[in-house]
Amino acid sequence: FQTSTFVFKTAEEGKRFFEVAYGKDSLKKHEQIGLIYSRINNPNMQILEERLAVLEDSEEAAAFESGMSAISTTMLAYLKPGDVILYSKPTYGGTHHFINNFLAEIGVASIGFNHNTELQEIWEELESKKLTSKVKMLYIETPANPTNSLIDLSIIKQLKEKIQQIHNHEIVAVVDNTYLGPIWQKPLAFGADLVCYSATKFLNGHSDVIAGAVMGSHDNILPIKTLRTFLGSMIAPYTAWLLTRSLETLHIRMNQQEKNAKKIVEFLTQHPKVKNVFYPGLSSMGQKQLDIYQSQCFSGGAMIGFTIEESEASAFKLLNSLKLIKLAVSLGSNESLAQHPYSMTHTDVPDEEKKAIGISEGLIRLSVGIENYNDLIEDLSQALD
């Protein structure tokens, strides 16, 4: 439906559509949002959102023109100057920049924590800075990009209950599920209010679309959709159609990527030149990480981190030697992609912070595609030799 505007049957119908769209009145039972203008909604977007909600087991979904527009609109819908956001580290470089630069500039404070941080430590830091009453959002990315470290989603209910009990206010818990969802992890089941995605990645899987999505209950999605209307960040009709088509093969693609990833992890862990392999479910990630994996993940997914030596030179040498695997950012596509997070996707994160949260100069991030795994292993083998 490549159109900018829609014809009303009557003037009364047009009036009613606008009343609902601008929040002057709520939808009645069995009433649907009317088609007005493609900045507000369009059939392709509505079909996509309905399917995304089914995949996530949520009431509603909101589709966006990019993953960052989904994340930033969600944060802006729920945060105002004086509020505090708690967020897990590491997180996607764009998210890190938005939190630590844009939100900071408008007066939203932030407290970061990593996978080793206990809830009590987070609480003590908040209390020491007198910020517990100001926390309005908990933002978690798990597995973390690019280290694959897992954040225990049980922290969501614990923190929400503690703040509700002491300060009698609700916080919004948001989980970036791009790495594992919607097949291999279900954050809503652990108390998350909203789940966000860069739909560019696994959801689309063809490296030909930029898109984002947020899923949750009707009440939690409503302020996000309202703000989306005025920011103009909704997904375009043709992009929505492409993404809807891609969802038809989602399970086939992701399951094949997972099978390939497990074969590659097995190869890398046994290769004498590979120092570390980071993949959810590996015992080498530590018992605590293994326990979290077993409690909330259905699979380790198709993202792998590994190091040869802790140097940029060693990482660049391997990346420049790859023949089949493409040297490019992004992830979750049919083709395998490899990149250097320290100098590329996470270049904006201060060097000291990168090292503290496990993003070393030698770390390579590999997004595994649907190629024959023997071909991928052969490519990695020749690049390592």
Tell what function each PLM region has.
Residues 33, 59, 210, 239, ...:
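Short amphipathic alpha-helical segments
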Residues 55, 268-272, 322:
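Acidic-histidine catalytic/liganding microenvironments
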Residues 5, 10-11, 216-220, 247, ...:
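Short loop segments at secondary-structure junctions
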Residues 60-273, 278, 284:
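Conserved PLP-enzyme active-site core in the AAT-like
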Residues 59, 100, 109-111, 123-130, ...:
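PLP-dependent enzyme catalytic core of the Aspartate aminotransferase-like
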Residues 274-364, 368, 376:
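Conserved C-terminal alpha-helix-loop-beta "cap" of PLP-dependent enzymes
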Residues 8-69, 94-101:
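Conserved N-terminal alpha-helix of the aminotransferase class I/II PLP-enzyme fold
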